[in-house]
Amino acid sequence: SRLLLTLATGTGKTSVAFQICWKLWTTRWNRAGEPRRPKILFLADRNFLVDDPMAKDFAPFGDARHKIESGEVVQGRDMYFAIYQAMAEDERRAGLFRKYPRDFFDLVVVDECHRGSARADSAWRDILNHFEPAAQLGMTATPLREDSRDTYLYFGNPLYTYSLQQGIADGFLAPYRVHRVITEWDAAGWRPSKDELDRYGRAIPDDEYQTKDFERVVALRARTEAIA
């Protein structure tokens, strides 16, 4: 019940996700084989990755759409959208995902699934584990490499891969040249000072942060501005 699609950035992952959800919804497919429409969750790690598809690609779902946020539990819709952070458990609250039965969703679409949800030690993984009875479709633009190995261990080998090279050859993507820039933070790493707080007043865990952590675990305003 775990499936993976790998499509290069810009080749239509969101459109493919919509078509899959739409066809399952209109044909009234569900895991139990009951005479009803499926319950589907579209899960991502940033609001714009949820809000934009919900408003545009998934517009044909109309009033069947609902975004899970602010602790509100709605169970009367069919097409749900959420970011991990809204559903996950943290030191301030129990996970909102626990308020939904384990078998509530028939399909969970995990957009940009390489961003950490498949890591065994990730709090986001708890969401996928909770909804384990559902079919889980991971979507990513990241081919198998060391920092995405957990994704492939969890979802398995891709059912279908549409590579960057294919996208360029087919005329959907423009050719490119890489210009690599190394900032001082990437070269030397970064460690917070003792008792340093983030912009929200929360303590930053004392650790050595490297390139792989930036924009995933921590975001440094000075680094972001330098790159921009």
What are these model-derived regions, one by one?
Residues 6-8, 38-46:
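Conserved RecA-like ASCE P-loop NTPase motor core of nucleic-acid helicases/translocases
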Residues 31-36, 47-71:
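Conserved helix-turn-beta segment of the N-terminal RecA-like "Helicase ATP-binding" lobe
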Residues 98-138:
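SF2 helicase catalytic motif II
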Residues 57-93:
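Inter-Walker segment of RecA-like/P-loop motor cores
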Residues 80-83, 135-140:
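Structural recognition of the conserved hydrophobic beta-strand(s) that form the central parallel beta-sheet
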Residues 149-228:
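Interdomain helical connector at the RecA1-RecA2 junction of SF1/SF2 helicase-like NTPases
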Residues 49, 86, 114-115, 144-145:
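Residues immediately C-terminal
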Residues 2-20:
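Walker A/P-loop
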